Amino acid sequence: LGAAFEGSSDDAELDRVEATYAPLAEAVRDLIDATIQTRADEEGILQARAVIEAVTQSLRREQSRPCEVSYRGDARPIPLANAVIGQCNPIAPPVVVHHDPDAADGRCWAEFVLGAAYEGPPGLVHGGVCALVLDHLLGEAASQGRTQPLFTGTITVKYLRGTPLGPLRCEAWVDRTEGVKAFARGFLSDAEGVTAQAEGVFIKPAWAREVP
């Protein structure tokens, strides 16, 4: 992925890279889920392991440094290797974030499914994964959809109850801004209601403070 995708701003090239590598990442996500849930016998596991190791070696023959962040025509960065939204990262669910262009508070949301790979307590999403998703959504709101360089200063998560594996929704917005700081809030919910709430402070780094 690194060799094929290094800081491109060409929409056609981005489309090509996504079309090539995103299905591979999705196949690996499916493999991860199958690995967790399989009850195959020892012979089946040994056969699967041999195939997986062979494929891994094949992919390692063509590698370079991780891909850089690239941009589409609207100047919004496309981090394909991001751990939350990266279409080409099999660790990412991936989450697709939507922004309300008419919202003054930078409101954004995402609906997604977390399966067995994200489990903590049996049947529930790991609390750290909940925090990961909330951190990202709050950051999306604070940074105006990844168009402003802001980084997490602090984030506080309040867990109201266990978050079940399955379909979820996350929503975030900016509560207020003070100079180089943006204060964001958000929540994670399932069909029964909110499972976790978060608030965070996002800070513009020193090198970006002269940028309008």
Where are these regions (language model features)?
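Hydrophobic beta-strand-centered segment that forms part of the acyl-chain substrate-binding groove
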Residues: 4-8, 12, 137-169
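A short, structured loop/turn motif at beta-sheet edges
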Residues: 100-106, 162-164, 192
